């Protein structure tokens, strides 16, 4: 499951979005406990920042670092790492944020 910062903290003027993302996190938690006995690994990913794309990949000047956004390839590598985890050390939740993101 893919969540957002709002999965774990609320922001002003985003109550509806936070409600949905908190609900998604709860669903992932319940499904993880329900499906683990059958060998199904459920993980919730918190994407805490913007994802670089064709528009966001450009820098706007010397004060705009390229590490301001998450790299799609790095996100995919993290997902694939979780898919390949041994059952003895499954991750339940992974938070991903770019170096330049405040938290």
Model-based region annotation:
Residues 1-23, 28-29, 33-36:
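Catalytic loop of short-chain dehydrogenase/reductase
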Residues 10, 52-53:
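Short beta->alpha connector loops of Rossmann-like oxidoreductase domains
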Residues 12-14, 56-59:
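Short acidic, glycine/proline-rich loop/turn micro-motifs
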Residues 37-52, 58-103:
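C-terminal helical subdomain
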């Amino acid at each position: 499951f893919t969540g957002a910062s709002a999965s774990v903290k609320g922001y002003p003027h985003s109550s509806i979005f936070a409600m949905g993302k908190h609900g998604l996190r709860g669903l992932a938690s319940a499904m993880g406990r329900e499906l683990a006995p059958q060998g199904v690994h459920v993980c919730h990913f918190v994407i805490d920042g913007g994802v670089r794309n064709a528009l966001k990949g450009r820098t706007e000047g010397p004060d705009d670092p390229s590490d301001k956004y998450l790299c799609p390839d790095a996100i995919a590598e993290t997902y694939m790492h979780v898919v390949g985890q041994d059952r003895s050390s499954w991750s339940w939740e992974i938070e991903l944020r770019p170096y330049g993101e405040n938290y």
